[in-house]
Amino acid sequence: MAQYTPMIQQYLAIKKDYPDTFLFFRLGDFYELFFDDAILASRELEITLTGRDGGGSERIPMCGVPHHAADGYIAELLKKGHKVAVCEQVEDPKEAKGVVRREVTRVITPGTMMEGKWLTDKENNYMAALAQVEGRTGVAACDMSTGEMYVTSLAGQAESVLDEALQYRPKELVFFGLAALPKTALPSTVVDAHQLDVFAVDSQYAEQAKGLDVSMRAAVNALLFYIGTTQKRSLAHMRLLKQYDAKQYLQMDGFSRRNLELTETIRDKTKKGSLLWLLDRTQTAMGGRLLRRWIERPLLSRDQLEARLSAVEALKGDMLLRSDLRTCLDRVYDLERLAGRISYGNANARDLIQLRMSLEAVPELKQYMIQTNTPVLMELANGMDECADIVNYLAHALVDDPPISVREGGMIRTGYDEYLDKLHTASREGKTWIAQLEQGEREATGIRSLKVGFNKVFGYYIEISKSNIANVPAGRYERKQTLANAERYITPELKEREALILEAEEKMIELEYQLFVAVRSEVAKHIPRLQNLAERIASVDVLQAFATVSDERGFVRPELVESGDYVITEGRHPVVEAVLEREKYVANDVEMDQTNRQVLLITGPNMAGKSTYMRQIALITVMAQIGCFVPAKQAKLSIVDQIFTRIGAADDLVGGHSTFMVEMLETRHALQKATAKSLILLDEIGRGTSTYDGMALAQAVIEYICQKIGAKTLFSTHYHELTGLAETLSGVVNVNARCEEREGKLLFLHKIEEGRADKSYGIHVAELAEMPTWVIERARSILTGLEANGSTGNGNAASDVQMSLETLWTAPVAAVREEPMQFASAEEEAIMAELRELDLNSTTPMDAMMKLYAWKQQLKKR
């Protein structure tokens, strides 16, 4: 390293401690990156890669970004899963002897982002830790931006427990004590025993740690250790630990949550089109985040659910009160993240004004809540701290409209600090003297255009235009600067007054900063109060959101029962209904119980609504178990402990699993974990193998569920032979997605009714997909031949099917009617192009219906 310049040697010494991190190295007004960091960053950020002489034989790769624009570039690297270490100059270059001293002041990782501009308002930014100790795995998760911290412990290996951590949608994972690391694409860090004492929980949590088992303590420690090594400032805003039991909540694996599109769509990975999108009528950012958490963790406690439902009912029934409540909530800023920034030390004066304005809304908010006269809302209101002392303190200390920067002054209110007021007076008097000087010099010289100006280079000056220079009395001024159209002058008296003004302003700005930091530190002492208040406001915000959407969409309060009955009258898919016009949506009933109607065997053609019907029932269950009203005319529901879904086709290329293998693994998971209180949705099990293998597996799965588990199950299939189970297996009932043939065309009615379907209508669906006419008519010819030989798929032997196919294969191809070539319009071409690019494996029924509806509207405009 000796061949490098001292500055590059300094860079390499610092970089050695951050090998897996981009080092943003401050040089003047830029952050520079060198060597491999520069090469990779230039690609990731699409910035120019240059080089510089570093003292070695070759030029060093280098790229850089302006310091004032660095946040945008850092955010881009964080989005791509990278870490960034910010290395600042920690001494004044003018006073430095040799190389300016530099230190890493913070390490920013995807899971430790604190700045609002890097975060999404209504999404948490969690990081999670898994720690395996003494046969159990602790799972801890925290969001540094809000101060939340949760911990639990589960039996089993980390691979199976990983799903619990993934429910937080973490941006980073930390592992401790794992024999084998689970496969994940998330940025991960391994903490070893030399870095972590399992039993030495941070003093902030020491008291609570007494109630944690060693695996939970290890998980918390792993998180705290990682955060401590990356963040070099106070973490006092990190809330007291919330220990929970995962069994208190309705369990869904990652595939089920994804398949039901609870918080994002399968196709676009966006919020729009998900259940969260439909229900999110929250007015605050913290309410939006809490809504997401409630959706991802539905409750099992009937008492808690009834309390929530009663609050929703009260708010739904009083539109005027709810409107006032929403208006009041709209005045509340993101208290959780404001508290985080205040404690972290990066809040500015505007943040504190937002805090004050939010707190000023609390008394009115409490009054509206108390008016509902419901236990949940009254308890929330009674526990709300109005923080009047903080409001008064901030109102006395800070002006109403401070600047963004805390280094410009203009933040502290007159009367807060006596010495600051004196400096303000001195500054004002100095500027008054300047104005008087300007007027006096105009009168003395007779030059009306004379003016006194200021810039940061020359300070105060007297400016006279070239046309008036001859009128300047000799010896009156000292020339300072010549411009194209003017001359600038100074006088000893002006420079003396300038020194006084600038000294006062410099002292004033520095004192204002010190006073602001003191104000911020004083408010930081009350972080727990602010966090408790934020949590209560978020809860009422979610409850009013449920009431608002329930009122607008005509949802009803579900009746929660313990009998095992599950009856929905005129149920609707909440999201599909919202996308389609209300009057066009076809509602459907469902009736299930623990004995006679345990398994609904659903038959019918593709696109007839089977999958939508199944998802609809699961979503209604989730909505009821988060305390929301449901889309139905009437609903009597038993509480469900787990939901399993096997809907859609997807392979696992990374894991080396085929579509059929994934199907079998997910079905096995449901069969192993489900209980009599679970809800299972199985879509076309067995379709990925031969007909008879698939049919045998499907029947065996149904029998196992009926005889060994007893879970309520919806099972869709194209194996019409399975419909015979309704006559031989207690608890199995046939229902079908009704459709009609009219003039050779298939009409989907989207109505689920009792009984089995006679056909699957696959050729009709292929025709809708605009398969070539030759293929459609040839398929019809083959089907006719199969039906003539008795091979209709209604239970004939495999040999009959094989004979029929052999006969058809050896028969001459019948003449197929050729249709004349028709040229499509521009609209039709555009629709066909979309259709060709459509990935059917990742398209949900809701996506398909939305597409069909949009295409139909396009064609109607022709």
From Swiss-Prot:
Alphabetized InterPro entries for the sequence: DNA_mismatch_repair_MutS, DNA_mismatch_repair_MutS-lik_N, DNA_mismatch_repair_MutS/MSH, DNA_mismatch_repair_MutS_C, DNA_mismatch_repair_MutS_clamp, DNA_mismatch_repair_MutS_core, DNA_mismatch_repair_MutS_N, DNA_mismatch_repair_MutS_sf
Superkingdom per UniProt: Bacteria
SUPFAM superfamilies with a match to the protein in the record: DNA repair protein MutS, domain I, DNA repair protein MutS, domain II, DNA repair protein MutS, domain III, P-loop containing nucleoside triphosphate hydrolases
Gene Ontology MF annotations: ATP binding; ATP-dependent DNA damage sensor activity; damaged DNA binding; mismatched DNA binding
Pfam entry (one): MutS_IV
Keywords assigned by UniProt, alphabetized: ATP-binding, DNA damage, DNA repair, DNA-binding, Nucleotide-binding
Residues involved in ATP binding: G604, P605, N606, M607, A608, G609, K610, S611
GO annotations of cellular component type: cytosol
Transmembrane segments: none
A biological-process GO annotation: mismatch repair
Cystines in this chain: none
HAMAP family from the UniProt entry: MutS
The family this protein is said to belong to: Belongs to the DNA mismatch repair MutS family.
Function: This protein is involved in the repair of mismatches in DNA. It is possible that it carries out the mismatch recognition step. This protein has a weak ATPase activity.
Protein name in the entry: DNA mismatch repair protein MutS
